[in-house]
Amino acid sequence: MSDILDMGGRVSLVTGAGQGVGAQIAKHLASASNSGGVAVNDYFIERAEAVADEINSAGGKAIAVQADVSDRASVEAMVTKTVEALGTVGVLVNNAGNAGAEPIPEQRKPFWETNKEIWDRTIGVNFYGVINCVGAVLPGMMKRQAPGRIISIISDASRYGDLGMEIYSGAKAGAAGFMRSVARTMGRHQITANNIVISLTNTPATQAWLEDPERMKGTMSKYIVRRPGEPSDIANMALYLASDASEWISGQTYPVNGGFTLAL
C-alpha cells in the first residue's frame, strides 16, 4: 500500500469480517502502512479465525474476536479483548449486517407477515449494532487524544428502499443518521465518522442473485459501471477513510456502487 494511506499506528476493529466485504476490509487495513493491527470480528468465530490466520500468515497482525453486535455486553467484551491484545481501538469499521429477508425479492414475505423476532434481530444488528460498537470504542478513542476513525457500511436500500426490505432499509437509514450526529459530536476530538454506501457486491450472501443470468442482465442495466461490486472496491474506500489521508473528511456518505445512484 502507498504511504499516503498511512494508518498512523492505529489499531482497527472490523465487525462482520469473517467473509465478504468485511474480510477484505480487515486485510486491507492490516496490510496498510503503519497499521497497528486488526481485530477481526464475526458472530461465527471460526470465520474470524480463518481471516485472522490469513492476515498473520501474510505478515500482518490480527486477532479473532467473537461478538454479537446487537448485544451491548458482548460488544464491550469484544472491545476489552481487542484493547488487551492490540491496544486502544483507533479505527472502527461497522460492517456487520443482517438483511432479515431472502436475497431474491420475489421470495421475500411482506414485513407484516413476518414476526417481531425477525424485526428485532434485523434492527438489532443493523442499527443497535452500530450504536453498541461506537459507544464501546469512543471512550478509549477520546482518551488517546489522537486522530480516530469510525466508518459504517450502509446499503443503497437505506436511501432508495427495496422490495420486501422495509425493516432492513429503515435500520440502515437510522445507522446512517446516527453516524452523521457522531461526526458532529466527535469532530472536536479529532475523530471522524463517515458512511460508505454499497450496492450489489460479489459476496457469499449474493450468489443466488449473481448466478441468475436473466436477473443480472436487468440489474446491471441500472449500473453505469456494468458489473457487480467486488469486496476490494469497498475495502479501497474504507482504507482511505481509515488513513491519515482523510483527516479533514467527516459526516459524509460515500456511494461505492458502480454509479447506481446516477442510473436511477
Predicted regions and their residues:
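Short C-terminal tail/terminal secondary-structure segment
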Residues: 2-4, 160, 239, 250-264
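Canonical Rossmann dinucleotide-binding motif of NAD(H)/NADP(H)-dependent dehydrogenases/reductases
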Residues: 3-39, 182
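Substrate-binding pocket helix/loop in short-chain dehydrogenase/reductase
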Residues: 103-120, 219
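Active-site helix of classical SDR
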Residues: 134, 171, 179
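Alpha-helical segment proximal to the catalytic Tyr-Lys
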Residues: 139, 184-185, 247
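Residue(s) in the substrate-gating loop at a strand-loop-helix junction
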Residues: 155
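Short, small/polar-rich loop/turn modules that mediate ligand/substrate recognition or access, typified
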Residues: 187, 192, 249-251
